[in-house]
Each structure stands twice: as C-alpha cells, then as structure tokens.
UniProtKB/Swiss-Prot annotation:
The gene is kdpA. It is a multi-pass membrane protein. The system is composed of three essential subunits: KdpA, KdpB and KdpC. Keywords: Cell inner membrane, Cell membrane, Ion transport, Membrane, Potassium, Potassium transport, Transmembrane, Transmembrane helix, Transport. It comes from the Bacteria. This is Potassium-transporting ATPase potassium-binding subunit. Part of the high-affinity ATP-driven potassium transport (or Kdp) system, which catalyzes the hydrolysis of ATP coupled with the electrogenic transport of potassium into the cytoplasm. This subunit binds the periplasmic potassium ions and delivers the ions to the membrane domain of KdpB through an intramembrane tunnel. NCBIfam families: kdpA. Coiled coil: none annotated. It comes from Yersinia pestis. The chain crosses the membrane at residues 6-26, 62-82, 132-152, 175-195, 253-273, 283-303, 327-347, 356-376, 379-399, 416-436, 483-503, 524-544. It is found in: Cell inner membrane.
Amino acid sequence: MVASGFLLIASFMLVLFVLSRPLGGFLARLIEGEPFSALQKVEAGLWRCSGVKNAEMNGWQYALAILCFNLLGIVLLFVLLMTQGSLPLNPEHLPGMSWHLALNTAVSFVTNTNWQAYSGENTLSYLSQMAGLTVQNFLSAATGIAVAFALIRAFARHSATTLGNAWVDLVRITLYVLLPIALIIALIFVSQGVLQNLDDYLHITTLEGVQQTLPMGPVASQEAIKVLGTNGGGFFGANSAHPFENPTAFSNFVQMLAIFLIPCALCFAFGQVVGDNRQGHALIWAMSLIFIVAVVVVMYAELAGNPHLSPLGADSNSNMEGKESRFGILATSLYAVVTTAASCGAVNAMHDSFTALGGMIPLWLMQIGEVVFGGVGSGLYGMLLFVLLTVFIAGLMIGRTPEYLGKKIDVFDMKMTALAILVTPTIVLLGTALALCTEAGRAGILNPGAHGFSEVLYALSSAANNNGSAFAGLSVNTPFYNLLLAAAMFIGRFGVILPVLAIASSLVAKKRQPAGNGTLPTGGLLFIGLLIGTVLLVGALTFIPALALGPVAEHLQVWLAH
C-alpha cells in the first residue's frame, strides 16, 4: 500500500510537469502580448462589436475593470437564479431560488468559490447550469489568471505605468486557453461515461420495485471547466463522488491533473517572462514539497482508520467511510489534497467523514491561502505575496533593503502584502466567532463538540479562501449562513485582488537594480527553504489555536481514549 501511494504521487507529479511545461510557454506568449495571426481577425471583430478599446491600462484602471466586470456578473447571475422557474430548459419545472440562496450562489460562482448550499439536480434548471454557472466558471477563472498576468508584467517591466488591458486579457484567456482545453477535457469525460445531454430526467422502477429518478443534463461540459478553472461546483450534489460526474479511476486522474494544470503552468510562465526560469522553478519546488508532505499525511491518517471500530467487529485498518470504492483511499486522499491546495473545492468523497487528522490537512491548506499551486491565477499571486514577505524578512535579518527580481520592496508594497495575507484569516476567525456566538449560527451545527466546531471553521475557511468544499454536516442553507458566507467569499476574493493590483501598480513603475553582493538569491535551495518556512510560520501563528480546538482536539479524543 505504501509503494502504491508513492507511485501514485510520483506518476501524478510527472504527468503534471510534462503537460504544464509547454502550456507555460504558451501562457508566457499571452502575457507578453505576442500576436496570434490566425486569431487576430476574430479579436478585431470582437473589439469592434463590443466597442472596447484595447489600449493598456494602469493599475487602478485594471482593478476597476475587473471589479465592475465581476459585480455585473453577480447581478446577472442573481436575476437568472431568481427567475429560472419562468425560463426555458427547465424540464423538472424547478422554481427560482430564494433571494438569500440566489445571492450566495451568485457571489460564490463569480468569485471562483463555487460554495453550494443546495443540490444541483433538485434546485437548478439546465439553463441556470449552462448560461449561469458554467459561464461564470469560465469568467471567474479568466479573472484570476488576468490578475496573475498583471502581476507578472509588473515584475517583468520597469519604469512603466501600464499592466496590460483587462478586457484583452479576459478575452484571450477565455478563447485561447480555457475554451480549447475545456473542450478536450469534456470529450475525455464523455468517453468515460459522463453525461452530456438535455434529456428529461428518467423515472425508472428498480429491481426491488421502487420508483427512482435518474437526473440527466449537460454534465461533461460543466465538469471540464469545473476542474480546469479550479471552480469546483458540481452539477450534482455529490459532486465528483457521483458516478454520472466522475465514473472511472481514469476520469478521476484527469480531474486532478486538470485542477493543477494551469496553476503549475503559470509558474513556468512566470520564470520565462521575468527572464529567469529558476524563479518559476523555485516556486514549483516550494509548492511541490508542501504538497507531497500533505498528501502523505492524509494517506497515513486515512489508512490508520478509527480504532474504536474494532470492538464493534468492524474493519478498522482503514477509513473507507464516505469514500467511493472505485477510487479507494489513496486516490481519494490525493484528490482531497489537490482540491484544497488549489482553490477548487471539488470532492470525490465526503471530507466530513475523514479522520480528524485527515480532515485537518485539507482545512489547513485552505487556511494558508491555497498557495500550494492554488487556484488559476490566485495560487501564483498568493505565493508571490509570500515571496515578498520572505525577502522582507530576509532583508531584516541581513540589514539590507529587501528586493526581488531587481525591484526594491518599499513600505507601501509591504503594507499591501500584509493586507492581502491577513484579510482572509481575519474573515475566517471573526466569521467563525460570529457563528458560534449567535443562535442562528449554532442552529446549523448538527454534530456536537470538537467536530461541530471544525465544521464551522471549515465552512468559513472554504468561503473566505474561495475554495467551496465543505464538511457537509453543517446545515448552511439558512439566511444567516447564506449571507455570512457570501460576504466572506466576496471580501476574501477582492480583498486580495485589489491589494495585489496595487502592488503591481507600484512595482511596474520601479527601475530594475542590478544584483549586488548582498542580494538574496531567490532561485536556489536556501530561498526555497525560507519560503516554505514563511508559509508554515504564518499558517501556524494564525490558525494553531483554532485548529487545537477542532481537529487536534478530536484526534486526541479518538486516540487517547483508545
């Protein structure tokens, strides 16, 4: 079993690097604005039809365009979800959502969180799934990548004022990257048995004579961008544990690769655009080391099982509760770490049924900001925030002004870095405290003790860090949780994006200084170790007290009692 686990991890990482390296080169061309002659006429037609000027924008113009674009998306999706009962492509005649659930869902999908306080097959029409959620899966992913593009340009350029054009970036990312790759992935899923139709639901009689309804729908097309764009929202309530959504071990492996594909490729693109591939490789090494350790810990915890099952005559050698037998513990553990290291949130098992230690690692990966590969775009700019913090700390230790890639890191940059890093932990801890201190918040907790606390902490961590997965034992389809989590998702998304673009606006105007004798090398093993240490230190200082009250206490209760 140990050998199988390491073989699975090694094969996954190998295939990931083989696929992401050439994609990184393609993304680098997009970042640098190299024209694609075959598609220039298509682009020109789009600009004429939309009336958009493709002149470059400064930092605040870029930020305003991104913010307005996403606010408009929230409004349009909210209206669609509220009125779906009166719209076509609704074979089950499902009514519109309540206003607070519609608001929560609209904010969720526009912010790339895909938190779902509902079950898709019982709540949403085909039109809402296709024109609402799937469209936002593309656009929210494009938003994150566009912000990463702007920050990469800020490091690559010097003595400049512009970061690119937000509209051009959004269109090119969608047309040249997301749509073609999503089409390929969707066809792979269809070949594996994932549904793709607009048929009415099937009403059948089982062998036992019981009536059963089988949901249908355009699943594969939504599933492809769900994983590629690190969105995570499932067509069905069971998400990727549902056999109509993720039927085979191969489709499961493809989903995991798709989740990490663009985040890993962006690291390669970063190194290429700034003119030093070692910079991108250093980020990949730091991310990979944290990721591999996290996977090993989860596999170990789930294989250890629950010792209290043995006296009951059950097999306690491994924890198969909440898992699909077609995937097994190893692939399920890997999927759980992939989806929470990235800001995806798709699940092929119930995280609420993991062991205390096995559930703590996905929770912690979200809490450190999902910078271990992370979401499309957000993972890279999140890790670059930790890079700036690392060079600042290193500069303090040696008594030099911190710099990165020849750019001096000044007071404004560090203020924005601190704001971006601290905004999500603040939301998580304050939101958890609010839920536990109010009757409406406590009413949703279905499990007592440490695990009930972990469910609330997980929900806020998932929402604020735009992940979307859940410990499903928490009842969240209430006005209190829908509004609280909607606020957490919105602030967690744009409370990081706006400071990142402010940093980009500051860096792009600076001159590039030649490296001196006292310059900290940022492409070697020493810096990789410092970066990992900084990520772990910030995560430890921020969340150890909360984790001690939840999963740590639960783990000790289980094993010390045994």
